[in-house]
Swiss-Prot record:
Belongs to the NAD-dependent DNA ligase family. LigA subfamily. The keyword Repeat does not apply. It comes from Chlorobium phaeobacteroides (strain BS1). CDD domains: BRCT_DNA_ligase_like, LIGANc. The keyword Zinc applies. DNA ligase that catalyzes the formation of phosphodiester linkages between 5'-phosphoryl and 3'-hydroxyl groups in double-stranded DNA using NAD as a coenzyme and as the energy source for the reaction. It is essential for DNA replication and repair of damaged DNA. This is DNA ligase.
Amino acid sequence: MDKKQAVAEIIRLREEIDRHNYRYYVLARPEISDFQYDAMLEKLVALEGEFPELKTSDSPSQRVGGGITKEFPTVEHREPMLSLSNTYSIEEVGEFYHRVVKLLPEEHRDSPEFVAELKFDGVAVSLLYRDGLLVRGATRGDGSQGDDITGNIRTIRSVPLRLGNPSGSGEGVERYEGREIEVRGEVFMTKTDFAVLNEGRPEEERFANPRNATAGTLKLQDSGEVSRRKMVFVAYYLKESSAEIISHAERLELLERLGFYTGGEHRVCRTLKDIREYIDGWQKKRLTGLPYEIDGIVLKLNNTALRDELGATSKSPRWAIAYKFPAERARTVIRSIVFQVGRLGTITPVAELEPVRLAGTTVSRSTLHNLEEVERLDVRLHDTVVIEKSGEIIPKVISVVEEKRRPGTLPVVVPESCPSCGTPLVKPPNEVHYYCPNSEGCPAQTKARIEHFASRNAMDINGLGKAIVEQLVSSGMVVDAGDLYRLTPDLIMRLDRQAEKSAGNLVNAIAKSRNREYFRVLFALGIRHVGIATARELAGAYPTLDMLCKASVEALSDVTDVGPVIAESVHAFFRKPSATAMIEKLREAGVRLEAEKTKKPVNLNFDGMKVIFTGALERYTRDEAAGLVRERGGKTVASVSKNTNLVVYGKEPGSKLEKARKLGVRVITESEFEEMLGEVGSNE
C-alpha cells in the first residue's frame, strides 16, 4: 500500500471507528461486535505505525494508550469546580425550589424551569478543547486545582478527541476554531465492566465498588492498562458563550451533537410535582437494577442567564442541588468505644465495630459525633446498632437495637480528662463538644496538627503519614510544623522502618512543599474555622502573612466569607506565642508566606459591575472580553435586566441592545469598552 492509499484508508477507518463509538456510547445502538471493532482499531494502529507521519492527536488509535506517566502535574481550573449542596430530604428539595423561585426576577417566577438529571456515582473531570481538539483532561481536585490526566482521559472511548457528531448530523468542529471550550462530567464504570475487572484480580486486591475502581484507574501511570479497563464519560456541563443557547437543556442537546454521551435521561420540570415524579420514578428504577450506579438526582435551574444572576457561595451554586437517595443501613455490634482528640482539642467518640458490608465497602468504625449523642442514643459496649452511610467517609450510628442488648451492660462513662495528656476536659457554654484545653502540650493535638499540615489540600507532603508523625512527635524531633523543615535523612533513619532511600524521599517531599501556594500555607496552619475557601479569600485580601498578622478583627470581618467569629479566631491565632514561633521557623525554612506577584490591571473600572456583550466584537473573542471584565472586578451575565450595569455592543447587535436602552442601562461601543479597560501594569 502506497502513502496515498494509506491516507484514504486511515481516514476511512477513523471515521468508521468514531461513528461506531458514537452509536455505542451516545445512541446505545451498536451495529458491530466488539471483535469487529477491535479488528478495525488494530488495522488503524498498524497503518499509523507503518506511516507515523500520518498519526494525529485526534486519531482513535490514541485511545490504545501505552505511555507511562511518572507524575500528574497540578493544573488550575478556568472556573472553580464547585460541589453541589445536597440533601436526603424530599422536603428540603421543595424548600430549595421555593427559595430559588423567590430569588428570580418577578417576570420569571410564574414559569420557572428546572432540569432534573441523574447523579452518576463516579469521578468528576474537566475536559478542555482548543480548536475543537482535546488538549487537556483534569481531575476535580480541590475544586480550584486538579491533576492533569490527559493521557488516561484519551483512552476513554466515549470522550471525543475531536468535537463533532461522527454521524454527520451534528455540529462541526468549525464552530470552535480559534476558541477554547470546557466540558465537565463524570467518569464511571458500569456494573458489568466493574465485575469483569474484579474477576481478574486476587481477592485481596479487588476494588470495593465501581467508584473506587474508577478513581484508582484514572491515576494509573500506565495508560495502556487504563485503556484495558472500560470506563464511560457522561457530560453534564458545557462552557458555551453563544447568545443563542440560553438554557441548560439546550446545552445538553448541543453536547450530544458534539459527540458526547449525556445519560439521555434528563427532564425539564416546570413544577415541584414534576420534580417529585422524576425523583420517585428513578428511585423505583434504581431498586429494580440499573447497569450503572446512581446515587441521586441533580436539579439545576434551566435558564443559564438567571443562574448568573443567582451566583454561588464559596462552596456551591445557589441554583442547583443534589438530592441523594436514602442512605444504606446495616446492623453490626460495637466492640469498643474510643475517644479521639482532634487538632483543635475536640473530643470525638468513635465506635469500633464488627466488620460489616455497607454501600460497597467494609465498615469497621463509626462516628458517634459527640458525647451528648452517646448519651442520647444510650450506646453501650457490645450493643447491636444500626449504622448508616449518607456520603460520609465514616458512617454514623443512628440507633440501638435494644431487644438485643446483653443483660447488665452499663452506659458509657464520659471521660473527665483528655485520653492523650490527662488534662481535665472543658465544655464551653452552648456547645455539644468537650475539649482538651492543653493545645500546646497535648501530644494527640500536636500529631493531628502535623497530619493536617501535611495533607493534600495543605502542604501535600507525600510520605508523611500517621505512623511517621506518631514517631516524630513521640521522639521529640517535631514540636510543631516548622520543625519538619529541620529534619535530615539521618534523623529520620532513627525511626522504625525508615531506610536511607525512604528517609531521603521524605526530606525531598518536605523541601518541595516550601513552594506551595500562599493560601495553602494559611490553610495548613490549622486556624479554627478557616477552611480552604476562606484561606483563599484571606490570601486575596492580605497578600503577605505579615499583613494578615497585623489585621484587626474589624478589618478581617470585611473579607468575603469571613464574619466576626472567623475574624476573632484568625486574630487570636496570630497572637499566640506558639504560632509566632512556628511561623518564624517556616520563614527561616523559606516557606512561601506571600502571594505570588502577578500582573494586575491598574484600574478596577468594572468592579462590581454586571456586563453583557451583544453582537460580533472585532478585537476580542467573547471569552477574551469576559475574562478582561473579570480581571477588573466585574462579571458577565447573559440577559439584560434592571440589575445590569453595562451593555457592550459590536456588529449586528441583537435584541439585548434595544432592551437595555428601554431599561435605561448604559450602552457603549467596543472602542469605548477598550478605553475602559485601561492599561495593564505590574504590582512589583
